């Protein structure tokens, strides 16, 4: 690939989005497998598989926080780097890359120390029961040691994709996912390590992906190179990145808070089986959301570059294409989930009781998922044009203003089956949030475009 990204401003939008989004979508699907393959294997353990699956689900809020810190840096830094490249300032983009790299190392050290000290206390607070805490702590003790690999893989890979090297970004995830899929059964079943084996397989796989990313960013093919002289924190460089990445951090860390709220409420009203069902539902939700994010990540360099180049027509066109694609995908997947829920639950558990409970919850939890393409397309475009305040507003309203209170209100509104009522909080919040997002986006996007020449 040529060491320039002018094609982002010249190639036909349909062809360009296809070229960038397809590898990103594939990467996100692979990333989904990376994240849920542990659950699939663990759920089929011959002894205690359902409880082990529930224990792993209790770990997810902590894992989400680790990923959220990677997003704080990368989802702000990568678009800022793209905008700088659109202005022709590759040196400034490399300073952003170096600042983000060193900050992620610092964050990794802090997170690892905290998890090794307080993981059991956190897991008990996050919904672990006496029957599941052993499985949860066994997984988290090992996972914590690989925090630095998670941070650097997720964080630095965003800078590879932001340069237009979407296939290389896809390979990052592919390498880790294939490694994890191969190592999981070896450690879980072959070496009889159970959940600890799943965690060890994940850490080793992330380490391999991390090495791949760092070798690329230090190699000859990259446009932006990771340089030692840029690896020092500069407030003027890193603070704008953190401001823009705050929306992604809020979205992902709020997922952790939401997950804790779901787990504790479901444990109260439905016991371990309800928490186990939520583990399966969150896995299916990941299946739904990650490809949507892949579409957004494919469109993001196009929108950011052309916004930096002040090409209003291409910015509008890229958003419309992203919106249509997101709606088609979300609608098709919603239909499949509604018609064939058993196809999804069978992947995670052979336990008939857990499968039946999950299928009943699934139709409630995903009732309005077909609308969520609007939410993701608008959110990703806000980030791509550097509209940090709007991105934060959308994230805060959906998670904190709507979903979090509804998790606790719905059982009171529908007391007949309080456990199932908890799952209804998700579609109720999504319906209101999508409406709010669409209205806000129509106003703010118009203002942003009107500032560009020939708008």
Predicted regions and their residues:
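Transmembrane helical elements of multi-pass membrane transporters/channels
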Residues: 19-38, 142, 176, 205-209, ...
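Alpha-helical transmembrane segments of multipass membrane proteins
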Residues: 36-40, 113, 121, 155-159, ...
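Helix-terminus/linker motif at the lipid-water interface of multi-pass membrane proteins
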Residues: 29, 33-54, 123-130, 186-193, ...
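N-terminal transmembrane alpha-helices
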Residues: 8-48, 61-80, 105-112, 147, ...
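Small-residue hotspots at the loop-to-helix junctions and early N-terminal turns
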Residues: 50-61, 137-140, 199, 272-287, ...
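Small-residue-rich hydrophobic transmembrane alpha-helices
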Residues: 53-113, 150-169, 277-335, 339-341, ...
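Short alpha-helical transmembrane segments in multi-pass integral membrane proteins
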Residues: 1-24, 81-148, 190-245, 303-368, ...
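Short runs within selected transmembrane alpha-helices of multi-pass transporters and secretion channels
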Residues: 74, 143-161, 169-177, 198-211, ...
């Amino acid at each position: 690939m040529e060491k320039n990204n002018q094609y982002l401003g010249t190639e036909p939008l349909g062809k360009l989005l296809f070229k960038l989004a397809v590898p990103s979508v594939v990467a996100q699907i692979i990333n989904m497998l990376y994240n849920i393959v542990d659950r699939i294997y663990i759920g089929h353990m011959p002894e205690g598989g359902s409880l082990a699956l529930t224990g792993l689900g209790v770990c997810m809020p902590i894992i989400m926080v680790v990923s959220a810190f990677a997003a704080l840096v990368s989802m702000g830094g990568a678009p800022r780097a793209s905008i700088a490249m659109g202005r022709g300032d590759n040196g400034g983009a490399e300073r952003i890359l170096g600042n983000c790299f060193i900050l992620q190392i610092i964050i990794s050290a802090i997170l690892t120390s905290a998890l090794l000290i307080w993981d059991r206390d956190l897991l008990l607070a996050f919904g672990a029961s006496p029957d599941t805490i052993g499985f949860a702590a066994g997984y988290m003790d090992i996972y914590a040691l690989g925090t630095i690999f998670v941070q650097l893989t997720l964080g630095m890979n965003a800078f590879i994709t932001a340069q237009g090297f979407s296939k290389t970004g896809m390979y990052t995830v592919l390498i880790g996912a294939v490694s994890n899929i191969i190592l999981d059964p070896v450690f879980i079943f072959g070496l009889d390590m159970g959940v600890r084996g799943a965690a060890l397989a994940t850490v080793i796989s992330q380490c391999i992906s991390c090495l791949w990313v760092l070798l690329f960013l230090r190699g000859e093919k990259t446009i932006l190179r990771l340089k030692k002289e840029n690896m020092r924190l500069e407030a003027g460089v890193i603070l704008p990145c953190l401001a823009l990445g705050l929306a992604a951090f809020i979205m992902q860390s709020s997922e952790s808070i939401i997950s804790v709220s779901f787990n504790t409420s479901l444990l109260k009203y439905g016991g371990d089986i309800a928490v186990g069902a939520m583990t399966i539902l969150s896995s299916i939700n990941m299946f739904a959301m990650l490809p949507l994010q892949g579409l957004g990540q494919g469109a993001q360099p196009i929108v950011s570059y052309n916004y930096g180049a002040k090409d209003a027509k291409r910015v509008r066109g890229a958003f419309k294409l992203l919106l249509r694609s997101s709606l088609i995908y979300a609608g098709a997947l919603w239909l499949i989930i509604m018609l064939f829920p058993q196809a999804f639950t069978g992947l995670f558990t052979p336990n008939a009781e857990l499968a039946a409970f999950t299928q009943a919850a699934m139709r409630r939890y995903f009732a309005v998922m077909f609308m969520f393409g609007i939410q993701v397309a608008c959110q990703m475009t806000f980030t791509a044009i550097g509209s940090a305040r709007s991105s934060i507003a959308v994230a805060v309203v959906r998670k904190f203003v709507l979903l979090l209170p509804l998790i606790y209100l719905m059982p009171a509104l529908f007391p007949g089956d309080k456990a199932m009522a908890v799952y209804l909080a998700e579609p109720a919040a999504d319906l209101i949030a999508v409406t709010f997002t669409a209205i806000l986006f129509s106003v703010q996007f118009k203002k942003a475009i009107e500032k560009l020449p020939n708008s």
